[in-house]
């Protein structure tokens, strides 16, 4: 492999992380165990976006999310028919994790756009939870 091949190869790698890991003191994604009505459940809890933090270099620019960017989340609660939002594994509609309204809960707080949903009882849901717990999957996007 020559230098040109190396350069092309590195340019073909898709970046799936928005933030430098060192720049975040709060985990962007974790598993929580909860007890509701006597039943134990595991929840995936995370931030799809954090306010006031520069993204990784996305080419010739970086993104910085404004705290007003997700005002629509609050607006959805007041509608007769809420706008549907889906949590998907790797943005793939073949791997749904949760849906709003339904099992997906979202809110905007002082940190960013927070979400949570119960770990789905599917092979990919359990695999995702195991990868989060192992630190292999560390974040998400929106």
Where do the language-model regions lie?
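Signature of dsDNA virion morphogenesis modules
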Residues: 1-141
């Amino acid at each position: 492999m020559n230098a040109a091949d190396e350069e092309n190869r590195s340019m073909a790698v898709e970046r799936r992380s928005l933030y430098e890991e060192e720049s975040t003191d709060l985990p962007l994604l974790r598993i929580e165990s909860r007890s509701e009505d006597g039943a134990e459940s595991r929840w995936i809890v995370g931030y799809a976006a954090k306010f006031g933090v520069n993204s990784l270099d996305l080419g010739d620019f970086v993104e910085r999310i404004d705290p007003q960017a997700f005002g629509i989340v609050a607006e959805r609660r007041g509608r007769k028919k809420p706008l549907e939002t889906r949590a998907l594994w790797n943005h793939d509609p073949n791997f749904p994790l949760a849906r709003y309204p339904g099992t997906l809960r979202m809110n905007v707080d002082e940190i960013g756009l927070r979400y949570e949903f119960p770990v789905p009882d599917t092979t990919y849901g359990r695999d995702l939870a195991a990868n989060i717990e192992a630190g292999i999957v560390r974040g998400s996007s929106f």
